[in-house]
Amino acid sequence: MKEIEEYVRSLGLDAYLVGGAVRDELLGLESKDADFLVPGLDTEGLRAALAPHGRVEDLVVADRLVGIRLHSRDRRIRGLTPAGIEFAPPRKEVSTGPGRHDFEIVADPTLSVEDDMRRRDFTVNAIARRLETGELVDPLGGRADLEARRLRTVSAQSFREDPLRLVRALRFVSQLGFDPDEELLVQMREEAPAVKLVSGERVGGGLAADGMGELSKLLLGSEPARALRLARDTGVLIELLPEFGPAIGFDQESRHHDLTVDEHTFAVVQAAADEGYSLPVRLAALFHDLGKPQAAWRGSDGRLHYYAKPGISERGHDRVGADLAAGALSRLRYPNALRRRVVRIVRRHMFQPGKGDERRARRFLRRNGDELAFDLIDHKHADLLGKRGTEGEPPPLDEIERLLRFREVVRRELSSPHRLRDLAVDGNDLIALGFRAGPQLGRALDELLDAVVDEPALNSRDRLLARAKELR
């Protein structure tokens, strides 16, 4: 950050470092933010001042022009800031009608830095540092709130100005361990319905430089369960993800689960975070059991069951949950590849490792592919860690140990043939034997691979060609 600051000073602007960069600096954390406030210049003036130093582009959020992004000509600075450096003039609210949401944010270069700080989201983000002197501008006590790990809005208008801040507040709870004050909780409950007004890209798919929205950042924090409970208790969760509605308070009536579906979900998400698992696994944890209320049916044993049963429940909770995940992730504009990956985890999360022998491990890799195989194991591990028995027993340690042994077997079998490209023959070899390109050829290759997965010693050219002749 020091190199970036020196570069910005060299541009001849009276700039202030603002937002997350100052907050993280005061917390002793590394920051990737490079946001600067420049009083005395409007957006056009900023563009003219920055244009000689590189490529400039408008910075637009929620259809509002909020500043200018500079992609420096300096290769060293460009390497430090691949997404560019953001500059903005001071801004203020202007009323556009009688309603409480009827206003817009406009640039006002005559506004003081202190007044600009007063229209930001939270006090911990309303601190600026002047590059020229190092002076801190902290009109709202943000530094004291940082020391107390306290989260406060700058005003009652904060969530109305931008409802995304409802999710950002939750993200700070998860990511930075902040405690929301009572007034903020009241404001969240009042403004929760407004979160539906926020575009999906800003919540999920991400318009930020790192390509992640606030929900993803929340899940990647260290305390996502605390944030999700807060989201539930303030009403934000059900507004953001209505798929959660039937799951909240749903009693699973199972000897394996003493937790309601929502509490089990939060426990699984937290376990995935504690284990450092990937974003796809954490997203799958969020959705994996949401299909249970819809799929539930009561058996002759008097208990609820969640698997498919012809004539009673056409789809098990895994399929229902996968559909719910697909719809929610699409609505939140998650990238297609990530969405498909999460949906597959949810759809297949009920797999059982069994005895965990080498053949089963190879079949598991064959069916799921390398990436999804370990996603499923990671998710299963988190799912087991999030279980509590009816008497409050701890997670099932025997199942966890069996799963972790299976993971090691799968890891060892990665070098064994389990993909079509691992076969000692290919489609051209079979065409030379008289197979026709098309479904017949595909079925033959699949049969050869299945045979090799079960018996790797078969994976020689001669043996596979001989076996292929039998399939013609």
Listing of model-derived features with the role each one plays in the protein:
Residues M1-R472:
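Catalytic cores of the polymerase beta-like nucleotidyltransferase superfamily
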